[in-house]
Amino acid sequence: MNSISSDSKKIKRYRRGVGVIILNKKRKIFIGQRFDKDKAAWQMPQGGIDRGEKAIEAAKREMQEETGIKKNFRVMHESNDWHYYDLPMHLQKKLWRGRYVGQKQRWYVIDFYGSDNEINIKTKRPEFQTWRWSTKNEILSLIVPFKSK
């Protein structure tokens, strides 16, 4: 009789999500500072894919929900693969009722050719307390380490 250890029964579960890299006319990237206790928590717009929703639809929805951008953009690129990250252990139990160990995300590059006054982070359920346009190197120094790999 074969016995299966409880460790091998555990299959890592990742929440399906999307991330959005919004580029302005100067090729800088939108980044927002989250409403978290950790004031250094900056990130690009991202979120989960709803049941029955396509990833591209989720990306556009998340962008609108988090930045207010509804027009003057075009999707330039979709990542070929899912990008995975594991949450730190203390967050795995706290977020999503402990159902997931992390996220797998499909990323989209968006060309935003509108003006800054079209961006409104004071949305129905705001995610960001402030935002700015940044370079790739600035972003890598600002985002939480477990998301930068």
Where are the language model's segments positioned?
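Acidic, metal-coordinating catalytic segment for phosphate/diphosphate chemistry
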Residues: M1-L23, R97-G98
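Entry beta-strands of beta-propeller and related beta-repeat scaffolds
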Residues: K28-I29
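A conserved beta-turn-beta hairpin within the catalytic core of GNAT-like acetyltransferases
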Residues: K37-A40
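A short gly/proline-enriched turn/hairpin at secondary-structure junctions
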Residues: Q43-M44
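Unchanged
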Residues: D50-P145
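Extracellular glycan/ECM-engagement signal in secreted proteins
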Residues: S148
